[in-house]
Regions:
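Alpha-helical transmembrane segments and their helix-membrane boundary motifs
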Residues: 1-89
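HAMP signal relay modules and closely related sensory coiled-coil linkers
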Residues: 79, 83-97, 105-126
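The cytosolic transmitter module of two-component sensor histidine kinases
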Residues: 84, 112-119, 136, 162, ...
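Flexible, glycine-biased helix-capping/connector loops in cytosolic signal-transduction modules
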Residues: 94, 98-104, 189, 296
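HAMP exit helix and analogous amphipathic coiled-coil linker helices
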Residues: 102, 116, 125-140
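… and, occasionally, acidic/histidine-rich disordered N-termini of signaling adaptors
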Residues: 131-312, 366-386
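Active-site-proximal, acidic helix/loop segment immediately C-terminal to a metal-coordinating Asp/Glu
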Residues: 203-222, 307, 311-366, 383
Length: 386
């Protein structure tokens, strides 16, 4: 972006001009007054007729000069004030247009080369800067919508087989974020689950996130086991990673016919699992492995468990447990578990929305600097292709 030269408006020069005009006008009046007094003194000292007549003429001429000076001064002052008033009104209208978001196409033009024209230049520079920020904001809003469109929503969740229920939520800390979640049917009997967190925020992280999501889904769609998927994705992300991003991730595959779940993780927080309706949640601990895009050729260990009907798995990114309040305290994994246990019987979507409300209440309005993503799946049992 081209750097613009900032202009400094010298308001003091306006005051100086007024003072100069005032002293010039005052000086002329003093000179004329002194001349009149001198003539009068001479007339008193020499009361001759011719001297008195000359004095009268001189006084009349001096008085006329004073009147002319005053008239011209007021005319000049009126024209000066009128020019400033018109220019200031134009500036006011121009700034009101900018303030309403309707940026004028043409720059503000005020001729004269004085402080008013300098002020107009400053306003034009401000308009260009605001236009650029507004353009960037609009582009980020479009990027946010595109990113949201890449993630499966309620419609995708309703299309899943009756043997499972899924709810998810993502709230980026900036306009676009580096978190991702995904759920999809690998085939009629197998459900794929993904949650991941890129090591940065904003547009670059969002682009890296999109690449990560595509690589994971493409490999899982081929029926590749989760551990091998992470290995392939890790090597792929390392091929062109000049920014030095890394990704924490958890991916799983559930056989909806029998509840068998294979999963692997890459440095991600442990999920919570609930075995049976009304049961307490416990961390689903496993080998955390290395983050993605961390080291080439790393082999990711895969874990397996069997889910029974009514079992749930709750996945999240560290934007949940590391959310902070006004005293700089963390929400923490303990509060996450407490909320899950207290709402063990609630619908997955209600658990997700309620957890978000609990975090917002805890933060008490403090701005959060990390993306927040959650995903919950409940295995209902039965055939995957019902």
């Amino acid at each position: 972006m081209k750097e613009r030269k900032k202009k400094k408006l010298n308001i003091n020069s306006i005051i100086v001009k007024f003072l100069v005009a005032f002293f010039l006008f005052g000086g002329v009046l003093v000179m004329v007054t002194v001349s009149i007094q001198r003539d009068l003194a001479e007339a008193v000292a020499n009361p001759g007729t011719q001297i008195v007549l000359d004095t009268r003429n001189s006084t009349r001429n001096s008085s006329l000069a004073i009147v002319v000076i005053i008239i011209y001064t007021f005319i000049a002052l009126f024209l000066f004030v009128a020019k400033w008033t018109r220019s200031l009104k134009r500036m006011e209208d121009y700034l009101q247009d900018i303030g309403s978001g309707a940026f004028p196409e043409e720059p503000l033009k005020i001729s004269g080369g004085d402080e008013l024209s300098e002020m107009a230049d400053v306003i034009n520079e401000m308009k260009l800067s605001l236009e650029e920020k507004e353009r960037m904001r609009n582009e980020l809003e479009v990027a946010r919508n595109i990113q949201a469109g890449m993630l499966p929503g309620d419609t995708a969740a309703r299309k899943l087989p009756e043997s499972c229920r899924v709810a998810a939520f993502m709230n980026p800390a900036k306009e676009v974020g580096g978190d991702l979640y995904d759920f999809f049917m690998i085939d009629p009997d197998h459900l794929g689950l993904v949650i991941a967190d890129v090591s940065d925020k904003g547009v670059p992280a969002a682009l890296f996130m999109a690449t990560t999501k595509m690589c994971i889904r493409d490999n899982m769609a081929l029926g590749t086991e989760p551990g091998k998927v992470l290995e392939l994705v890790n090597n792929r992300l390392l091929e062109n990673n000049k920014a030095g991003f890394f990704v924490t991730a958890w991916i799983g595959e559930i056989d909806l016919r029998n509840g068998h779940m294979a999963f692997a993780m890459a440095g991600h927080p442990f999920p919570f699992v609930r075995h049976g309706e009304g049961a307490k949640y416990e961390p689903l601990q496993s080998d955390r492995n290395l983050v993605l895009a961390g080291f080439p050729g790393f082999v990711y260990r895969q874990e397996e468990i069997d889910l029974l009907p009514g079992d749930r798995v709750f996945l999240y990114t560290d934007g949940l447990d590391e959310a902070r309040d006004t005293d700089n305290g963390f929400f923490g994994k303990e509060r996450v578990k407490e909320y899950l246990d207290a709402h063990s019987g609630a619908e997955p979507a209600d658990v997700i929305s309620g957890m978000k409300e609990a975090v917002d209440s805890f933060a008490a309005g403090r701005e959060q600097f990390d993306d927040l993503t959650m995903l919950m799946v409940e295995y209902k049992g039965g055939s995957g292709n019902e």
